């Protein structure tokens, strides 16, 4: 249950941001500093719960290497991965239906992995995520009638993290959430390159889905292509976990 509590806690941060934007009429919502502090507190609390749940001897599954003891790196690695993941999912919510569609493909691959290895609770958790996103997508596809805002995207980010950690294999996010990785990396690269070169850009706009949008791709094409790419990543993850000797 700690994963669900974590996702709800992250969603509350998103809700606070949306509330300030909509009700208080402050377009920027929470400041970056406020978001970072709040997210950091929630992430640390979640890591503590995971640490205690592992009997204070944290480990992580790595394909073909088995369960590897993490030691102090559990905290460093965990914080970086979780912080990056929840914000990368948030970045993906930039055009109608994109975040929901990509998260459905994420959920499908994680559901298969969990079911294949008889982790039925995690499989159910992923199934609920798929169902929720599919139901929301009815209203969120282009042209969207309903928007998830930071409340929804942060919750999805929290669930993505929770499911990966429920299988104790956060590294699998590199494949099952490859679009999240690309979106987050494109934003970091754009900002870094902009600062280093004093104004030059790698992409027309970041995150990268906006680059394709400005290159003439329709929103529907972006959603379709990104979802297919993430589904391919998910299929690769299923194969990797099957042949990589996955076991908790």
Specify the residue positions occupied by each region the protein language model found.
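Membrane-interfacial loop-to-helix junctions in multi-pass inner-membrane proteins
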Residues: 1-4, 23-38
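Internal, non-catalytic "lid/hinge" segments that mediate substrate recognition, gating
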Residues: 30, 38-57
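Membrane-interface helix termini and inter-helical loops of multi-pass transporters
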Residues: 22-23, 54-67, 245-248
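Hydrophobic transmembrane alpha-helix segments characteristic of membrane transport
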Residues: 16-24
